[in-house]
Amino acid sequence: MSASQGNVFTRGLSRISRRKKKTKSIQNSLVSEQQPSFDAAIVPMPIPNDKSSIFSKGMDRLRRSLRLPKKRRDRSHDRHLSPDVTGGSKTEQWQPDEGAVRTGTCCFNVKYLGSVEVYESRGMQVCEGALKSLKASRRKPVKAVLYVSGDGLRVVDQGNSRGLLVDQTIEKVSFCAPDRQTDKGFAYICRDGASRRWMCHGFLATKETGERLSHAVGCAFSICLEKKKRRDEETAQVNVQSAQESTSSTPPKDIFHPNWEDNTSEGTSTQNPSNSRSNLAYQSFRKHVSIEDRYLDPQSVIINEVPASNHMDEIRRISKPRPTGNPALFLRQGSLRAPPDMPSSSDQFKRNMSLRTVSNNPTERSPEKKSFGTQLYNEPIYEGDEDPLGLGITPPVVTKTSGSLSNNGLDGINLNWKSIPAPVHQMQQHNANGDFVAAWPQNTIEKPTVGPLDKLQKQFEDIKLISISSGENTPTTRSKADEWLDDVLRVSMSMSPTSPSSDPPSTSSYSVLPKSGPPPAHAPPPLPVRQAVSNGSPSIYQQQLQQANSTRNSPAGINWNSSPNPMKISQPPAKPVDPFDVQWSRLAVNNTH
């Protein structure tokens, strides 16, 4: 057992010793073959003994920690080859940026400060002032990535949103410059497409300098200019080719009247293979443009062709008149669709007379009906009795003729009637005897005599002639009592038994008291207190009531044909009539009709 066990231990120890010998030989070979280089910083350490294996393991870990990672080793290699070390210029350092801009892969990590409106399209002072104002604002900068290409500038948010902050075409950019106060600052001025204002966008580069960003944008300017020149040249060439093709095309008569039996066109097509692809669809893209340019800007590859024109198009051009609106739509149309035979629709609708037919001739107009409502002119309201006896007799409507245009107090009174006042003592004598009919004045034909009323008539006729010739109306002021007396006078004249109201006789012995003028030949009888008027002028009706004190009946109520003695007819005594009741009853009757 002991021998076998000893053999086991001895074999194990020998194996361990062999391994240690191999590791020592490997380390010695590495140290001998190792040469100095910039890739790894190796610290020369003394070779540990066999007894210090733990120390050797710790040193190996230290060596591994001192070695630079691969990315840092690449950057250190670039640092050794940088222009600052080698003495090269900045343009050589930024030379790869131009190729990256052409391929559309140039990008920089920046902090987007925002945009502010400026009032000039170029200038370093303008950009520096905009950057200063953006830094002074309390807006938090946004971490973003600036992509620079020949088409435009794009700013993409680097946060969670990954949204597009700015998408600016390079044609709209007018100026760009770095900030001379800070190395990381950069700004460019562009025209805003929506508001048409000059806006300045500010950036702060995180890893690069503002000069490098400005150089990349300058490369984008040059690439855009080259594309524009190339596009203009190709467009000019295409225009020349299209003009040549239009001149060498077949005449119009051959187009409208083709000869299908002629095979000359087939021979020409076989001789010139280029004519077989005369369709413009095959020539719509430029053949010499590279795939990269087509991928970056596919719209610029398409040729803007001018349509070919021939003289037949000029023949077909017909000038069309300028469209005009219907003039009837601009005419003001009334609400009434009246027949064409009417004079005008506006005459049928007037203020306060929408349901009346009013003629244009002022001489044929009927007098307007008096009402208690609002009137167009300030006229006194009639408050007297139109039918004082309650017999249903209305005063006749007197129409004005062309000769009586002036408004005076004697309008409607026939001044041709000759008036002789009846003596009062005779009337009283007949009344005492009971013969009331004899006391009533009778019509007698007398010779024309010149009395005070005739003089008054001549005076008023002269006034009318003067007013008609001068075209002015004599202003008269009439009181309510005067109007009431005139109306009572017309009623009493219409109640005359011997003279009808429609055609009054030329002469009459009926006494007429005018509204104004000289007094009559004799004084009138005294008036009762309850029938006296405020102005003190008596009426005809009051004189008749004084004459018939016994019966108080009106002569118009006597039946002249049936009874010779009117005193035998019993009539109820006349009751006083309220003028307001008469007016309201008349309005009610008119409304029912």
Swiss-Prot record:
Membrane topology note: Peripheral membrane protein
SUPFAM superfamilies from the UniProt entry: PH domain-like
GO molecular function, one term: protein domain specific binding
Impact upon substituting residue 17 to Q: Promotes accumulation of num-1 in the cytoplasm
Superkingdom to which the source organism belongs: Eukaryota
Location of Phosphoserine modifications: 17, 65
Domain comment (free text): The PID domain (phosphotyrosine interaction domain) of isoform a and isoform c is capable of binding residues 212-224 of pkc-3.
The protein, known as: Numb-related protein 1
Originating species: Caenorhabditis elegans
Name of the encoding gene: num-1
